[in-house]
């Protein structure tokens, strides 16, 4: 007999009247009015009390054995949508979900509803109006805060608006924001007497429609406009979220939060940059500690600091995290010249050039981690920093690093600090490990600061998911100029083509003639036999690398001076043998983008490439007498590309109910072989290359997953 059962049997009997009186006293002691809780002063958690007799109601959840919540996700967090009067809500203007607070233990078992507020006001006829084209003008007399979900443009007419570390002032320029709830959503805050406009983003239609091609892009925006009947909602790409009851179903919205220690350090750094415009800051720390978030807040604070001169508002980002880069596609290191605040997520700006930023120089690791070739990682980082020193030394520099802080990763960080010599090193954790902190502090010549980490409690996308989304977004890009309403806004913005990659005409590149389009294929980390080359690279992501000088091959063994030795496979595909696993010299080469090798036509001897790289760029490189090498390595397998057409043909639209499971932030992301949810609906359509069809409860055999080596081994480990 269990202890619980023993307690129930031995318990002193209580009369029904005594039980009723006890429960009424317990209910009377519970809070009746709205209470304010939370870590932030501007966040309210509203508890609605019930009548005293409601405690006597039997809860179905109590009549059965308690179930252990999966991944610590409490089902009560997903609250039902609440009805809202039309007067208090503008159609096509906002929704979001929130986390529920812990219930009062005195009221455990009672039917309660916990509501978290995200906005300090409601729309009314007095504080807003809807203009032509779905533009919402807000006239706020008091300091307010509110949360907007979706894609929108913001223009300040009077007053100030702050979001994601940026402060926006009256201007004719529209700042464009992408706020999906798979990332932390920024809160908008205003001062007294502020007038602003929220503009629908017509360019967002393409990226929202990527949900038709992959479950990764579904259920991450505001509610589908088609669910509302009003004309305004059909034109809108955003919604204002008032409370957690307004949230889309089955989603957890986390606000972008900056702890007090962060705010203090950010203010100090911005003030220092006024006296020293070339301030350099290196941000490091363990994974999921908030390095990218802090970098984004710092960047936006520098770019919108009003005390700076108008013509000097630019910041250089040295992005050294190949697994989760902010601007360039995954697998690359880049030097980025930024002129506008970063108000979107990485998968909303994966291009190498945009009106808000320009990737000055980029190198490919052909991998999402520096582990395969630490020496190449340091060489690429050194070249990018040298480029900054030669051409952009007068601008502030922010260095973002990967979350690899042990073993070889710690050696790499120490080497980077010694090379860059930043004015300040920020370590985004106060919990060590001591070995890493002491080593980094010793390598730092000037200031070393530890800040508290800010991890996300839950996430609907793992790091592997986000890399896939960023890569998929990159390959669906197309550049265009956009004119919005009557405002002068003709700057180039990103636009996405939501058609499957398999339906597009590929770029045909001859590989066997004397005027072939590429010098050859080059493999990092592993050189397969020539007979297997075609099958090895077909269907994979490759990096297109411009050879600026033949000295780029100086590391390769050569019997004679350059050009390098080029061999051919049985299909006459040219490749550069790399059995010694050496790399191109980054001082004489650069990555111009990524390509997807869709197919190899052995009859016409052409490579079929899908890429957003403009054809003019290829022609410009060839006209200068330079060569292009296609780099093959350990890029993530583009599983999303193989199933796009299947999902589209299955009719799984963006507005369906399939969503990805919410997991903990530190979930193991090494699940590239796991099929996304919703794959069952497309399994019987047709046979597709590189797609394995599993029916029913069928599973892959044991050992079919990719085996990967340990990443934490030291660089100088001899294996003895």
UniProtKB/Swiss-Prot annotation:
Polynucleotide 5'-kinase involved in rRNA processing. It is an enzyme of class 2 (transferase). It comes from Gibberella zeae (strain ATCC MYA-4620 / CBS 123657 / FGSC 9075 / NRRL 31084 / PH-1) (Wheat head blight fungus). Residues 1-91, 663-686, 698-720 are annotated as: Disordered. Pfam families: CLP1_P. ATP binds at residues 285-292. Its main location: nucleus. Keywords: ATP-binding, Kinase, Nucleotide-binding, Nucleus, rRNA processing, Transferase. Its EC number is 2.7.1.-. Belongs to the Clp1 family. NOL9/GRC3 subfamily. It is found in: Nucleus, Nucleolus. Residues 663-672 have a biased composition (Acidic residues). One of its GO terms (biological process) is rRNA processing. GO terms for molecular function: ATP binding; polynucleotide 5'-hydroxyl-kinase activity. GO terms for cellular component: nucleolus. InterPro entries: Clp1/Grc3, CLP1_P, P-loop_NTPase. This is Polynucleotide 5'-hydroxyl-kinase GRC3.
């Amino acid at each position: 007999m269990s202890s619980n059962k023993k307690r129930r049997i031995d318990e002193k009997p209580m009369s029904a009247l005594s039980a009723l009186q006890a429960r009424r006293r317990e209910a009377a002691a519970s809070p009746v009015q709205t209470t304010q809780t939370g870590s932030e002063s501007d966040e309210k958690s509203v508890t609605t009390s019930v009548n005293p007799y409601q405690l006597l109601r039997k809860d179905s959840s109590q009549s059965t054995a308690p179930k252990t919540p999966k991944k610590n996700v409490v089902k009560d967090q997903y609250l039902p949508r609440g009805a809202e009067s039309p007067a208090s809500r503008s159609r096509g203007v906002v929704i979001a979900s929130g986390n529920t607070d812990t219930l009062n233990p005195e009221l455990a078992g009672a039917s309660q509803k916990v509501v978290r507020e995200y906005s300090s006001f409601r729309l009314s006829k007095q504080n807003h109006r809807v203009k032509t084209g779905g533009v919402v003008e807000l006239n706020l007399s008091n300091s307010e805060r509110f949360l907007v979900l979706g894609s929108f443009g913001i223009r300040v007419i009077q007053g100030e608006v702050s979001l994601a570390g940026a402060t926006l002032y009256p201007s004719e320029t529209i700042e464009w924001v992408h706020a999906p709830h798979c990332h932390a959503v920024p809160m908008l805050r205003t001062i007294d007497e502020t007038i602003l406009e929220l503009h629908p983003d017509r360019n967002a239609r393409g990226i929202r429609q990527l949900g038709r091609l992959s479950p990764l892009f579904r259920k991450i925006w505001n509610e589908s406009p088609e669910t509302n009947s009003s004309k305004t909602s059909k034109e809108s790409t955003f919604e204002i979220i008032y409370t957690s009851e307004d949230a889309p179903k089955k989603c957890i919205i986390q606000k972008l939060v900056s702890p007090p220690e962060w705010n203090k350090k950010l203010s100090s750094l911005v003030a220092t940059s006024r006296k020293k415009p070339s301030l350099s800051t290196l941000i490091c720390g363990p994974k999921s500690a908030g390095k990218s978030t802090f970098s984004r807040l710092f960047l936006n604070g520098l770019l919108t600091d009003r005390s700076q001169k108008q013509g000097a508002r630019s910041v250089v980002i040295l992005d050294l995290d190949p697994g989760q880069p902010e601007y360039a596609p995954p697998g690359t290191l880049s030097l980025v010249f930024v002129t506008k605040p970063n108000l979107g997520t990485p998968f909303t700006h994966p291009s190498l050039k945009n009106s808000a930023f320009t990737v000055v120089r980029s190198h490919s690791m052909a991998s999402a981690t520096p582990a395969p070739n630490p020496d190449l990682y340091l060489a690429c980082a050194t070249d990018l920093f040298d480029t900054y020193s030669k051409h952009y030394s007068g601008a502030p520099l922010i260095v973002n690093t990967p979350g690899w802080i042990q073993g070889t990763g710690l050696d790499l960080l120490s080497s980077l600090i010694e090379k860059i010599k930043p004015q300040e090193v920020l370590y985004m954790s106060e919990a060590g490990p001591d070995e890493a902190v002491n080593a980094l502090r010793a390598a730092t010549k000037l200031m070393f600061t530890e800040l508290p980490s800010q991890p996300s409690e839950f996430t609907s996308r793992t790091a592997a998911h986000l890399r896939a989304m960023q890569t998929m977004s990159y390959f669906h890009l197309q550049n265009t100029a956009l004119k919005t309403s009557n405002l002068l806004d003709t700057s180039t913005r990103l636009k996405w083509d939501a058609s499957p990659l398999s339906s597009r005409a590929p770029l045909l590149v001859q590989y066997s003639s004397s005027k072939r389009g590429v010098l050859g294929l080059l493999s990092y980390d592993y050189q397969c036999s020539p007979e297997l080359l075609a099958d090895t690279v077909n269907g994979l992501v490759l990096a297109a690398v411009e050879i600026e000088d033949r000295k780029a091959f100086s590391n390769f063994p050569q019997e004679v001076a350059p050009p390098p030795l080029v061999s051919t496979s049985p299909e006459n595909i040219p490749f550069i043998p790399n059995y010694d696993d050496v790399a191109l010299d980054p001082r004489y080469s650069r990555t111009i983008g990524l390509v997807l090798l869709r197919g190899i036509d052995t009859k016409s001897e052409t490579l079929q490439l899908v890429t957003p790289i403009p054809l003019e760029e290829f022609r410009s490189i060839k006209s200068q007498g330079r060569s292009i090498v296609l780099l093959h390595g350990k890029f993530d397998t583009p599983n999303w590309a193989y199933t796009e057409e299947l999902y589209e043909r299955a009719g799984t639209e963006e507005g369906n109910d399939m969503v990805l499971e919410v997991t903990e932030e530190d979930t193991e992301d090494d699940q590239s072989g796991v099929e996304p949810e919703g794959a069952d609906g497309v399994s019987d359509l047709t046979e597709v290359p590189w797609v394995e069809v599993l029916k029913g409860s069928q599973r892959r055999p044991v050992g079919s997953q990719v085996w990967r080596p340990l990443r934490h081994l030291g660089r100088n480990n001899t294996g003895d």
